[in-house]
Amino acid sequence: MGLPWYRVHTVVLNDPGRLLSVHIMHTALVSGWAGSMALYELAVFDPSDPVLDPMWRQGMFVIPFMTRLGINNSWGGWSITGGTITNPGIWSYEGVAGAHIVFSGLCFLAAIWHWVYWDLEIFCDERTGKPSLDLPKIFGIHLFLSGVACFGFGAFHVTGLYGPGIWVSDPYGLTGKVQSVNPAWGAEGFDPFVPGGIASHHIAAGTLGILAGLFHLSVRPPQRLYKGLRMGNIETVLSSSIAAVFFAAFVVAGTMWYGSATTPIELFGPTRYQWDQGYFQQEIYRRVGAGLAENLSLSEAWSKIPEKLAFYDYIGNNPAKGGLFRAGSMDNGDGIAVGWLGHPIFRDKEGHELFVRRMPTFFETFPVVLVDGDGIVRADVPFRRAESKYSVEQVGVTVEFYGGELNGVSYSDPATVKKYARRAQLGEIFELDRATLKSDGVFRSSPRGWFTFGHATFALLFFFGHIWHGARTLFRDVFAGIDPDLDAQVEFGAFQKLGDPTTRRQVV
């Protein structure tokens, strides 16, 4: 045929059987990738420390999606929440991966069958004897079936009526587990952080899809609308399908990057805005304040802070800190977190408590500045020693740790104080193992960042694809060079000069 690479899909343009075949093969490839990727991730995943080395620190991409849909256990005898299990059941991580691979194989065989047996009676128009598809009817069928699936997911899987439920957590990502969810039918259902909205929206959207599908199966489109929207052209289907996909991709890029109930921080890592707003820092200080109000000592109050909460309050877990071309997991960057050293409190020789200014997201380096409770600069690590007024040595800064591994330990040596002041810029201080993975010390992004970047990029590409194919189908006659007045131009006697529309004969 000699088609250029960008025109190869024309071979299925008027061939319904093989059009179906290539779509089944595409499903086989997607499902096969998902199952294979899951098995690869399970082979390299270390479930031993769900607090300091969770899936998102290890760069897992498909395991979080399985987990949020209710998968908890592995045939390896471990659970994602920690501990061991004896009976994981068939729907473990490996079971789901295997089901995808088996499904992929069946789709592969079905694709081959439909490629070989392409000329089926079902695709033949009785009136013309040529292959054709009733596209409005097919649209109704697909809408009805997707509505059933959507309703079933919301009414059964998410609610736990027939299924495991979904991953639900608290606002600080500490108590997450798989549980059933009741639909939220009030205004709270529109809050993106309320899990009940997932159930109610799927039930509502599924019901709408079922009704819309039945409508399109029972009502034919008006002729003018059919022709105006080119409903008989398969490229119209392509264009509108691309529109649905790019719209969904833009939406999920947003829910992933800004956070929602569908993207829990325990599975995908925290968002950059939680660092920017001091979200976890405020909660930590609130808990410490509550402990002090109960007459606990400062050391006891800080020791009650969960290590998991302290770990979220570390800039290395900010997905916006990873560079665009820094491949690999977060653990390959700053290392595997081993333990929390504790919260450092700095004081000058006059007894003022000092706070280290934290590094903003988009800085790679940042001056070390210590301020008091009123925001007045009291100490710093100067760039030029000759002009310094507030150096650690001059001000006499000391540091004492509360909670964590260094609880009760204090340092007055200026070099050590400056070391911990630099590290306090990055949030809570953790001991990091860089040797095991040969980590290079340069921050990486989490799966939250990769997912957002990938979906936003492909959404933009697919947007242009929608415009391209929509224009092709709407203006097909123009691009093909077929003029609506062509018949008149070649009709004998229509013009005084053949083909010249300015010399049209007047009908008497």
Curated annotation (Swiss-Prot):
GO MF annotations in UniProt: chlorophyll binding; electron transporter, transferring electrons within the cyclic electron transport pathway of photosynthesis activity
Membrane topology: Multi-pass membrane protein
An example Gene Ontology CC term for this record: chloroplast thylakoid membrane
Pfam families: PSII
Quaternary organization: PSII is composed of 1 copy each of membrane proteins PsbA, PsbB, PsbC, PsbD, PsbE, PsbF, PsbH, PsbI, PsbJ, PsbK, PsbL, PsbM, PsbT, PsbX, PsbY, PsbZ, Psb30/Ycf12, at least 3 peripheral proteins of the oxygen-evolving complex and a large number of cofactors. It forms dimeric complexes.
Family the UniProt entry places it in: Belongs to the PsbB/PsbC family. PsbB subfamily.
Protein name: Photosystem II CP47 reaction center protein
